[in-house]
């Protein structure tokens, strides 16, 4: 009887460990996917220019800039229209600049890739126009 109980408990423990590991692996894969659509690389080394264009793009999209730190490379803003907070970080990587946007509505992260695609499309257009001295 005791042997049967020990075998059952052992099997349950092994099953619980396997489930936990699977959840951890799925969570890491999900994080990588999220990071992928939240991040874009731009072929420039001018961090200040990119940050200025991010501020302009966020304002064009209805965000009020709450904080911008050029030394650290972060910009935060809030949209009263749709109650959304967005923080964008900028960091150099080789001969390019990596930009990562993170948006949330209340306490819930925005996970729709299209929202980030819209932001990066507007930012790309702004950088293009600035580079070609249209603005």
Give the residues covered by each predicted segment.
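C-terminal motif of bacterial Sec signal peptides marking the signal peptidase cleavage site
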Residues: 13-16
């Amino acid at each position: 009887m005791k042997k049967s109980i020990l075998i059952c408990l052992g099997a349950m423990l092994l099953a619980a460990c396997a489930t936990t590991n699977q959840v951890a692996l799925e969570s890491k894969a999900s994080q990588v996917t999220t990071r992928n659509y939240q991040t874009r690389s731009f072929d420039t080394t001018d961090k200040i220019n990119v940050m200025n264009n991010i501020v302009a793009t966020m304002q064009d999209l209805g965000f009020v800039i709450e904080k911008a730190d050029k030394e650290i490379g972060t910009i935060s803003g809030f949209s009263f229209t749709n109650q959304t907070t967005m923080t964008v970080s900028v960091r150099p990587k080789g001969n390019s600049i990596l930009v990562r946007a993170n948006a949330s509505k209340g306490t819930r992260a925005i996970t729709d890739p299209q929202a980030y695609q819209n932001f990066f499309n507007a930012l790309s257009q702004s950088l293009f126009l600035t580079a070609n001295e249209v603005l």
